[in-house]
Amino acid sequence: MVCTTLYTVCVILCILLMYIILFRKMIHFLIDLSLIAFVISSCIRLSNAQFFANDMLYNGNVEGVINTTNIFNVESLCIYFPNSAVGRPGPGKSDGLINDNNYAQTLAVLFETKGFPKGSVNFNTYTKISDFINSIEMTCSYNIVIIPETLANSETIEQVAEWVLNVWKCDNMNVDIYTYEQIGKDNFWAAFGEDCDVAVCPLDTTMNGIGCTPASTETYEVLSNDTQLALIDVVDNVKHRIQLNQVTCKLRNCVKGEARLNTAIVRISNLSSFDNSLSPLNNGQKTRSFKINAKKWWKIFYTIIDYINTFIQSMTPRHRAIYPEGWMLRYA
């Protein structure tokens, strides 16, 4: 009986050994197959999720009210305007500034009459034009940027509008070491800072200057002077030496991407050449770029509130907001 039991045990052990030797690869195959099936099933469960395209890096907090029943909607409106528009509190002042410490609450209540829920409108001030490259992020469903226009800054405003109304991909530039060239019509160099004086020297295929001497910056052609923001456009596919004061100005190599459809710009102008076709009172031109002919900031905000639907209808809201590495967007 004992011998029979031992024989049986030996036979079982031999069978197991043969199974392990002959069918080990099959076991590994089955394990791998199970893992693949698990991954595929996980992907299928996520197939109804939304996918997003890169926009630009986000370094701040989201401003807005998140819809808890649909986390892919960010129902909010951000309005950016210069902090110089806010004056000192006092009744009956005629300086045209917002002389009220509670202006945000007052405007928010007026926006409620147009259908914006309480807490969904955010008022943000900026100090200088270059803030729009350096720090400001368009993180709301809808964004309206208000910029005063004068004869002195009309060129800058054109370039700010180009920057704000589009999505950009940028890299830092080291002009001390490298030469740079632009490779297409959507490739620009963005200069921003306190004082941007940018001059260039185009080079031929032998690295000699075209109309300039690379070693002598005095012979360079000036493209920007005394500006806070400039989009530098040079001849494509030609290498350039670049000269600028890197203490007061930074330069980035940028490529324009898709339109930022959730953002509109409002230019405040009282110039004699005011283009009335861009006024929201005439429904604008649906280009997300408007003009308001006014000097008083309360009048400006009242006009924006009263015609907010005209602004909103020219835009497409941003759906979805944040993940740790930066913010991404997708339009409806």
From Swiss-Prot:
Q: Where in the cell is it found?
A: Virion; Host endoplasmic reticulum lumen
Q: Where does this protein chiefly localize?
A: virion
Q: Which domain of life is it from?
A: Viruses
KW GTP-binding (keyword) present: no
Q: Which InterPro entries does the entry link to?
A: VP7, VP7_1, VP7_2
User: Which terms in the GO cellular component ontology are assigned?
Assistant: host cell endoplasmic reticulum lumen; T=13 icosahedral viral capsid; viral outer capsid
Q: What does this protein do?
A: Calcium-binding protein that interacts with rotavirus cell receptors once the initial attachment by VP4 has been achieved. Rotavirus attachment and entry into the host cell probably involves multiple sequential contacts between the outer capsid proteins VP4 and VP7, and the cell receptors. Following entry into the host cell, low intracellular or intravesicular Ca(2+) concentration probably causes the calcium-stabilized VP7 trimers to dissociate from the virion. This step is probably necessary for the membrane-disrupting entry step and the release of VP4, which is locked onto the virion by VP7.
Family, per the entry? Belongs to the rotavirus VP7 family.
Annotated protein name in UniProt = Outer capsid glycoprotein VP7
Native source organism of the sequence: Rotavirus C (isolate RVC/Cow/Japan/Shintoku/1991/G2P[3]) (RV-C)
